[in-house]
Amino acid sequence: VNPHPNADKLRVCTVDIGGRDKEIVCGGSNLYRGEKVVVALPGAMVKWHGEGDLVEIKESKLRGVDSYGMICASSEIGLGDLLPADGDHVIADLANFDCKAGQPIAEVLDLDDIILEIDNKSMTNRPDLWGHYGIAREISALYNLPLVEIPEFPKTEQGDLDVRIGDEERCRRYLGVEIDGLYVKEAPYKMQNRIWKVGMRPINALVDVTNYVMLAVGQPTHAFDSDNISDYITARRAKDGEKLVLLNNEEIELCSDDLVIADSQGPVGLA
């Protein structure tokens, strides 16, 4: 990684693409010697800075220096949600992946997969099929195939979590589990990858686990920080004009038709 002779914000990189080197000019802010990066060679299609239409990479001269490809940010190859960047002009750093120079990125990230889309409009009467495990169980029964059972955790002592139902007509059952000793960190990549493949965005281990459970067994779940829950948690109708801040920090105004999860201070989530 060398300075560009004519541009302070650019670097001239010699990149091993598998048995041969390519000189590529790059403006990534996180470049370092020995970094594992994603390279688009001439002919590849990318989204410049992750925006607009796809453009074809060509050999070019950038501020007087020849460049034979592009070192990519994750958003430029459609992987911004799977490999989120920490800031602007940050390229995808594959330091945490076991890969070698020249290996296809789809292979490195386990993207070369087959995804089956199952339209469940015709089986709304079968909520047991709304998750991956339900479909697997059905296929197992139809074709007499072995089914891997989901292990059960042993029951523990009853805690002091106060869970209530404030609208039994619209919510017949609402359960809570309190888990101690957790902290926020990234989920394992395998979990993030599976969540991303079905169109969801990985967030962190706690959020991803709840979404993973929903996708696996069809049961929606949500994690709350017990330090932020006052007195109890309940499923009830919202009051007209109540406000709720969503996970994306967007504030919405609720009406009495909305079903919410709330504590003694007000709504903490949409049901």
Where are these regions (language model features)?
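Residue "hotspots" at secondary-structure boundaries inside conserved domains
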Residues: 29, 252-253
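Phosphate-backbone binding interfaces of nucleic-acid-interacting proteins
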Residues: 1-153
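A structural connector/turn signal
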Residues: 26, 248-249
